[in-house]
Amino acid sequence: MFFKAGTRRALQKVGLQKCSKRLYHPTVLPSLISTTSPEFISKKEAMDDLIEELDAKTAKARLGGGATAQERMRSRGKLLPRERLALLLDPHTPFLELSSLAAEDVYSDYIPGAGLITGIGRVSGRECMVIVNDATVKGGSYYPLTVKKQLRAQEIAREHGLPCVYIVESGGAALPHQANVFPDREHFGRIFYNMAQMSALGIPQISSIHGISVAGGAYVPALADENVIVQNQGRIFLAGPPLVKAATGEEIDDESLGGGMMHSTESGVTDALARDDNEAIIRVRGIIGDLGQAGYRGVLPEEKVEGPVYSAEELHGIVGTDVRQPFDMRDVISRVVDGSRFREFKKDYGSSIVTGFAHIHGYPVGIIGNNGILFSPSALKATQFILLCSQRQIPLLFLVNVAGYMVGSKAEKGGIAKDGAKMVRAVACADVPKLTVIVGGSFGAGNYGMAGRAYSPRFLWMWPNAKIGVMGSGQLSQVMTSVSKDPSQHATLKSEIEHQSTALYSTARLWDDGIIKPTDTRDVVGLGLALASRRPSSGNQSRTGRSTTWDGNGMGFGVFRM
């Protein structure tokens, strides 16, 4: 996850209309944090070390398949995948990369970034979803997580009306993994289904072919609204020369079978022939520049935006890396929102959850943050706040650090199950964009009530210290003690659960959209809100800007069990 210069200016240009001026002046949140205390310094050092470790992993992943593979690509006169990306994007504009550590330590082979670069950036003045095959990683083959990463990018593009740009160079499915790549609903074929569906919705699909595009991969350029192919470099065919010979006896070279000249002059599969990578990318920029203003419009933030009163660097010492250590979520909010101003809702009721209104980079947002375990009053308060934001069409930001809902006879008699269900239902049915940042723990049903992945937030990011699981390893150890008397089994399971709960484990499996630094939270969320402000300029939606599941279209909230 990284940003180029000009983030503030770029956020202002995402939309085309101005927000109405806010008429109130929320209170600046106070801060009692001592940045010289031993506790603060200890937490900060631990967080700094963790971020340094993740930075090293991210830097390695961005090298793709390594120096040898890169040199092989250069020797063929090709630009590297990230060089193509840099040439495509407008200079000095932010690029929000998604899931850069996908597939980290998942497969026996090293598959950095799952062999795919995805992210949101500006092309010819227009925000686009960019999907780049990294042919330095196993020839750009599709592993199960490669497919999952591309489908997630398409999901984000569809929700926000972002044109998709596919920079293609791929050998297709990784055959040893074909059982988990090819046949099911959310496998390889879904990529092409999504392209067809988005094109039908008026969301442009543009591709540029820089190398081989074989078998199912041939349908990426074939299904694109408009495409470009590089001469003597791009190849599009359903079956390569060896398979053609085996099937038909015909002997033919790959250029004659599926090269750029043939497809541009005879088959008509491609629309433009480029001399090299540079020209192909320039042509794609021209295509995006000619899309016009059809599709989606946005809302500009307020012209005058205050930065937070307090330094974002202090977040490292406030939160630390141990999710068992409590902190006040207001100290996080005050280092993220404009002017550190926050109009808190129901401050004295349900105090284990913090709710209120703020602005981030000028965009209005309703914030729900945890300050401990969720009790019935906390759940009811959050439910009411979600209903308010839904009614007022204010996006929701969930700042998550939750151990779950309260348990025990008193809680059960008090109706924690039905009250928690109200909150979960409200989150599921809220018809406004939801953004989630896990800043600490996200355990048990608390994950559901705080807009976990299953509840279709527009984006879900994790801080490096974040943990996610059915329960914490300490709680699990206590449960195991009651059901098993083998101490060695307890230790092994606790270690395994601890490992599987980390942010790195999560992001490698695409349970989130990437790990972000605490100091980047304001800008990342600001870009998310800017994208969420985009609304269809036409269509049959009765309420524009509403958020639905990928394949759901439910309206309203259903029945709350009182």
Feature names for model-found ranges:
Residues M1-V28:
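N-terminal mitochondrial targeting presequence
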Residues Y24-M562:
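Ligand-binding clefts of soluble mixed alpha/beta catalytic domains
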